[in-house]
Amino acid sequence: MASESGKLWGGRFVGAVDPIMEKFNSSISYDRHLWNVDVQGSKAYSRGLEKAGLLTKAEMQQILQGLDKVAEEWAQGTFKLHPNDEDIHTANERRLKELIGEAAGKLHTGRSRNDQVVTDLRLWMRQTCSKLSALLRVLIGTMVDRAEAERDVLFPGYTHLQRAQPIRWSHWILSHAVALTRDSERLLEVQKRINVLPLGSGAIAGNPLGVDRELLRAELNFGAITLNSMDATSERDFVAEFLFWASLCMTHLSRMAEDLILYGTKEFSFVQLSDAYSTGSSLMPQKKNPDSLELIRSKAGRVFGRCAGLLMTLKGLPSTYNKDLQEDKEAVFEVSDTMIAVLQVATGVISTLQIHRENMKQALSPDMLATDLAYYLVRKGMPFRQAHEASGKAVFMAETKGVALNLLSLQELQTISPLFSGDVSHVWDYSHSVEQYSALGGTAKSSVEWQIRQVRALLQAQEP
């Protein structure tokens, strides 16, 4: 229980803590986010103490009722912090003592803040992962719905930011949706590793008082129990894994945002953002800026920084708990808030995006069919390397003459290869071009529809 100084650890100390150190050491400004899960963990632990014979039933009921009152005050915004509340655990225990008296001093029996805080963090992150998983599935579902509705729209596909081949607009959407399905799978796997109970591990050596950890696990609905008390209280690999998941997901979202920023410029004019996800200029009245997408792109760097920062904190720590681990929570809270906002904004952008079909169509050009010209020769029996060279010669001839590739006459093409014949005219049909790529995963309509079914099946399988 807290000493006269209000500290949970004050018994062996003489004199006051330097006020600067007091502020430096305090984490209540941000770990107050854990108030609800801290109460949940304490309620479960009180039941464990009662089963172990360390609390009477009356004492347990007194503690449970007091904790309910603490939670009620937090929920209603009436909980008052004191200057000595250095963290959420101190604050809740101090208030519990004010409400129920000395019985509150038994709650911490055999428990350390080391196993308490990591239990709180795992509980909080488990809830947050569920929320993020739901938001990510909504975004992916929105993208798939759009891909299905606009699967007949063709536009240029790019490599090296140069026009490459005609593809379906839906194929582009699905390329990003499929990447996000892997992020969705990864998040569920991270959540499984978060969902492991450390409570009952004490500070380092374990619990000597017969507390039933299986009871604690069941009370808090954890999937498993940590295997080693030293590892349980000091390891933050689950935090690092969550931050890496967020970094990778933000990488995918940032790349999609970059594409849409480019496609929305006057130079491309393929898409137009809704006013709801754009802003203007304080000087230039004509401007409509894609701030939503630019912020998604920029916040990726913020998330990366949090991930790298935590790894740097962890890499040099000696075994078991060190105060350095206090740095984990700000990273988790900030990244969680960022991801929630980004996923919601990205869903809004995709659901309200306007596409300019005619501009997409006009951007298609015959030179993008040079690969198809090579495939034409392959189907006539020419080895691909020779066909590639022949198509390249046709491109060079067209550029030299200053004409489009499809305007070369049959006679001119036959000077490159006698395998060219009248049916080469089919090569210049963009719809015919995309339909060639019918192998699973390609841009043909049948393949795009197969992709849509596959992604929807993945989403359904991930529903809780």
Swiss-Prot record:
Enzyme activity is regulated by acetylation. It catalyses: 2-(N(omega)-L-arginino)succinate = fumarate + L-arginine. CDD domains: Argininosuccinate_lyase. Pathway: Amino-acid biosynthesis; L-arginine biosynthesis; L-arginine from L-ornithine and carbamoyl phosphate: step 3/3; Nitrogen metabolism; urea cycle; L-arginine and fumarate from (N(omega)-L-arginino)succinate: step 1/1. It comes from the Eukaryota. GO terms for molecular function: argininosuccinate lyase activity; identical protein binding. The modification N-acetylalanine is found at A2. The active site is at H160, S281. 2-(N(omega)-L-arginino)succinate binds at S27, N114, T159, N289, Y321, Q326, K329. The keyword Lyase applies. Expressed in lung and brain (at protein level). Its EC number is 4.3.2.1. InterPro entries: Arg_succ_lyase_C, Argininosuccinate_lyase, Fumarase/histidase_N, Fumarate_lyase_CS, Fumarate_lyase_fam, Fumarate_lyase_N, L-Aspartase-like. The modification N6-acetyllysine is found at K7, K69, K288. Keywords: Acetylation, Amino-acid biosynthesis, Arginine biosynthesis, Lyase, Urea cycle. Acetylation modifies enzyme activity in response to alterations of extracellular nutrient availability. Acetylation increased with trichostin A (TSA) or with nicotinamide (NAM). Glucose increases acetylation by about a factor of 3 with decreasing enzyme activity. Acetylation on Lys-288 is decreased on the addition of extra amino acids resulting in activation of enzyme activity. One of its GO terms (biological process) is locomotory behavior. Pfam families: ASL_C2, Lyase_1. The record marks E294 as: Increases basicity of active site His. Catalyzes the reversible cleavage of L-argininosuccinate to fumarate and L-arginine, an intermediate step reaction in the urea cycle mostly providing for hepatic nitrogen detoxification into excretable urea as well as de novo L-arginine synthesis in nonhepatic tissues. Essential regulator of intracellular and extracellular L-arginine pools. Homotetramer. Forms tissue-specific complexes with ASS1, SLC7A1, HSP90AA1 and nitric oxide synthase NOS1, NOS2 or NOS3; the complex maintenance is independent of ASL catalytic function. Belongs to the lyase 1 family. Argininosuccinate lyase subfamily. This is Argininosuccinate lyase. The gene is Asl.
